[in-house]
């Protein structure tokens, strides 16, 4: 029932307005959530999705933030939180026959990675 007042040292990195639907990014994020830094890099290297490269860069950025800002080693961080939130839609129109225009919605999302050191 008591609350734990220990403050966890965590490093975070986020990509905002990433031009991909949230569902496609979640497909990749769900595979790496809770894994170690090395395991996540190996998984992302061999997954065939377009979101993998951006998430790989984001994980590398979070590890660099942990190393530079908090002094944590790169040997044993793991991904404690990984989330994808929907963002705004970019609305465009595709010209069609006889003066019509069809709406095109280009979805974006926000990706956030939080890493802590595994003890």
UniProtKB/Swiss-Prot annotation:
Primary location class: plastid
Gene Ontology BP terms: translation
Alphabetized CDD domains for the sequence: Ribosomal_L22
Coiled coil: none
Disulfide bond entries: none
Keyword terms of this UniProt record: Chloroplast, Plastid, Ribonucleoprotein, Ribosomal protein, RNA-binding, rRNA-binding
Cell compartments where the protein resides: Plastid, Chloroplast
Domain of life of the source: Eukaryota
CC annotations in GO: chloroplast; large ribosomal subunit
Any one GO molecular-function label of the UniProt entry: rRNA binding
UniProt entry tagged with the keyword Ribonucleoprotein: yes
Family: Belongs to the universal ribosomal protein uL22 family.
Task performed by this protein: This protein binds specifically to 23S rRNA.
Assembly and binders: Part of the 50S ribosomal subunit.
Protein name: Large ribosomal subunit protein uL22c
Organism expressing this protein natively: Angiopteris evecta (Mule's foot fern)
Encoding gene per record: rpl22
């Amino acid at each position: 029932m008591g609350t734990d007042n220990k403050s966890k040292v965590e490093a975070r990195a986020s990509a905002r307005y990433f031009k991909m639907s949230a569902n496609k990014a979640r497909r990749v994020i769900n595979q790496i959530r809770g894994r170690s830094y090395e395991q996540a890099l190996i998984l992302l290297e061999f997954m065939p999705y377009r979101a993998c490269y951006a998430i790989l860069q984001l994980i590398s950025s979070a590890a660099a933030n942990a190393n530079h800002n908090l002094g944590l080693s790169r040997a044993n961080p793991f991904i404690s939180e990984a989330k994808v939130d929907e963002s705004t839609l970019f609305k465009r129109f595709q010209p069609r026959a006889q003066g019509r225009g069809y709406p095109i919605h280009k979805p974006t999302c926000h990706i956030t990675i939080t890493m802590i050191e595994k003890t």
